[in-house]
């Protein structure tokens, strides 16, 4: 099974062909080019990329053990290779060579007719060559489709099935979210949750910090902006104990850190609010700027300081 990576790592382009392979026809082999690069951070994985000219490309990390004939020795040796990847939807045969930890060559995908007959029986027939390739690359499984149907997701498009395979949306992940109150989320929300790792553990962690009964969209937003329990505790240690989620997100977006807070306090703003800190960050006001302004006007406020900065950048917008 392919390992899940961040969305930026997965490149999966569907350019659906106008001519589909009907369920009664034998599916011809599909060919293209492959590239493999050994992962310097994880010796058990490689970066596998497959492409079919300009039509489709796919890239992801995959365990070495999932590629028959691949050896970790190829990371440091030159060799001609014959490799194989067996998935439910078909078998990839790869030929090529390795040099300096990088491999490249040609592949040939032989579709599994039994798999596509079972897929057609579930309503997914007349698939294009690109969709056949997609099913094999994502390691789509009939058992996973049946699990989704049993969980109430029985009206999924073929592209939804691809997403379920890529982002590991299955009975277990659905049950995990249901255990914390998110019952029968729309499928696109399941995808978002999987991409940004919103699971029962994260929900319980946020609840333990006082953020209870948050809508699923807010939990995703927290993950997008990396609002972790550690970050929440960091903000509270800065003396801001009762901030709502929107204010936390603002602080994170504009990089309001304990160091920045201490810099502002040392420059003379000993009592400063989160909103004021955000405004200072927005207008790129640092400790040196504050000290210079306070040397000219010891009683200057944050608001006046921001107005002064705006006026310096846009003289025509002077304070009326």
Predicted regions and their residues:
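Bacterial N-terminal signal peptides
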Residues: 8-18
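A general sequence property marking short-to-moderate contiguous segments
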Residues: 2, 20-21
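General marker for long, soluble alpha-helical cores
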Residues: 21-320
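Bacterial N-terminal signal peptides that target proteins for export
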Residues: 1-8
